Amino acid sequence: MSTAICPCGSGNLLDACCGHYHAGHPAPCAEALMRSRYSAYVLGLIDYLVATTLPAQQAGLDRQSISNWSAQSTWLGLDVESSEVLGGQPEHAFVTFTARWHDGQGEHSHRERSSFVQNSGRWYFIDPTVQLKLGRNDACPCASGQKFKKCCAGYFGS
């Protein structure tokens, strides 16, 4: 058992916090998934970052860029401002946070309001940088069985 403190900022041990999700257990809520994804960046767990992105977007991720950013950054902290569960079927949520890191260009701070969707008992990050070619009447990429316009359309970046 690790005695390392979890990088997500909870103050808990990694094994009792985000490490539990990194080992394959589903995050119980969008905020827990977001915290575990931040910890995955800190720890270089690229497979986890890909696996927790909406499955329809995973092929569009640049694994090498994610790996480079993770490895070349010194992660300075995470502050969660709010977590908003919107309900519905499938369930959607927003998490607003600020992540801080240092790299070769200096210190950075990034504030984001991320979108998440739950399907089959698992939460997924909807990546606004990975565009999908979908019409409003196409099946939703979250696999809910609904039309895109009635499900996740409002949660994708414009």
Curated annotation (Swiss-Prot):
SUPFAM superfamilies: NTF2-like (SSF54427), Sec-C motif (SSF103642). InterPro entries: NTF2-like_dom_sf, SEC_C_motif, UPF0225, YchJ-like_M. Signal peptide: none annotated. Pfam families: SEC-C (PF02810), YchJ_M-like (PF17775). PANTHER family: ADENYLATE CYCLASE-ASSOCIATED CAP C-TERMINAL DOMAIN-CONTAINING PROTEIN, UPF0225 PROTEIN SCO1677. Belongs to the UPF0225 family. This is UPF0225 protein Pfl01_1218.
